[in-house]
From Swiss-Prot:
ANK repeats lie at residues 100-129, 152-181, 190-217, 218-247, 249-277, 279-305. Pfam families: Ank_2. This is Putative ankyrin repeat protein R835. Keywords: ANK repeat, Repeat. InterPro entries: Ankyrin-EF-hand, Ankyrin_rpt, Ankyrin_rpt-contain_sf. Transmembrane segments: none annotated. It comes from Acanthamoeba polyphaga mimivirus (APMV). PANTHER family: ANKYRIN REPEAT AND EF-HAND DOMAIN-CONTAINING PROTEIN 1 (PTHR24127:SF1). SMART domains: ANK (SM00248). The keyword Repeat applies. The keyword Ubl conjugation does not apply.
Length: 308
């Protein structure tokens, strides 16, 4: 039996495979030869699993001595079954066929279904293996269940923040997740706190909430990322709150001038940041930002007049 994992819409997969289209031209797939136990290995967000019949005369190419993954340009002659991984009965059938429960529980599409999640845990799957990207689904009911089951919750906070799920963020913080938690298994950058993630993604309500709950904003890298990505409201909020611009102020200003974020540039200038006007006029001119050049020249002249 041949299996392929895919993220494509199952109806499109079924239609095009049955037409005999070349799978490698249309989809990113992974073939498993009689190894259903390995079907969930790899990505954590496969949406369906397709069971295919291939020509018997096909000469398969093995990609590695210890691997059972195959990539060939072949034409499908039939789609025997499509297992939708958000469907409990389909997941149960795959497990009954021999799919690895500890690989299955890593799939966020599967565990976002409460029945499938309960079934895997009943079968003995390791709850610690649930991928942190489950938080991008924002399903509070799932996380309430996981909390009761004593699943480690810290790793979900940065992802919930990144995807803008304020209610889930509140739930996690209220359940004791450290507001400045850094998931070092995914982020090697030592300052990528949930607040930094919220600033980068532009989620002002989450920024406000995290700071209210004690997140460190004074010397946060978040002001730089918010400035770089043009999130005016977040930059203004952080500056008004008194974030320390000594560490990231000039670096942020350099980025906003490079990208032409005029209004954000004014926030930094008006904050009292000491800058080299000649340098930034030159940088803005190189990028063709004439509005910024004019403003900086005006500010420079004003400063010079004040010194007279």
């Amino acid at each position: 039996m041949y299996y392929a994992s895919t993220c494509m819409d199952h109806e499109i997969v079924e239609k095009k495979y049955k037409l005999g289209l070349n799978v490698t031209d249309n989809y990113k797939v992974r073939y498993n030869i009689s190894l259903i136990s390995q079907i969930f290995e790899g990505r954590c967000d496969y949406k369906n699993v397709v069971r295919l019949s291939l020509p018997k005369s096909l000469d398969l190419y093995k990609t590695g001595s210890n691997h059972y993954a195959y990539t060939l340009e072949v034409n499908m002659i039939n789609v025997e079954k499509i297992y939708k991984l958000d469907n409990f009965e389909d997941v149960k059938e795959l497990i009954d066929l021999g799919a690895d429960i500890n690989e299955a529980i890593k799939n966020i599409i599967i565990v976002n279904n409460i029945d499938s999640l309960k079934y895997l845990l009943e079968k003995g799957a390791n709850i610690d293996l649930i991928d942190s990207y489950l938080a991008k689904m924002g399903n509070i009911d799932i996380f309430e269940f996981l909390f009761v089951k004593k699943c480690p919750m810290n790793k979900f906070l940065p992802i919930a923040v990144e995807y803008g799920h304020l209610n889930l963020v509140k739930f996690l913080v209220e359940k004791g997740v450290y507001v400045d938690f850094i998931d070092r298994t995914k982020y090697t950058f030592s300052e990528y706190t949930p607040l930094v993630a919220a600033c980068s993604a532009g989620h002002i309500k989450i920024v406000e909430y995290l700071i209210e709950k004690g997140a460190n904003y004074k010397s946060s890298y978040g002001v730089y990322l918010a400035a770089e990505k043009g999130h005016y409201d977040i930059v203004k909020f952080l500056i008004d709150k008194g974030t320390d611009l000594e560490k990231y102020g000039l670096r942020s200003l350099n980025e906003v001038i490079k990208k032409g974020h005029f209004d954000i540039m004014k926030l930094f200038i008006n904050s009292g940041l000491e800058i080299d006007y000649d340098y930034y006029i030159y940088k803005a001119g190189l990028r063709g930002h004439t509005d910024i050049v004019k403003y900086l020249v005006m500010m420079q002249m004003s400063k010079q007049i004040q010194k007279i």
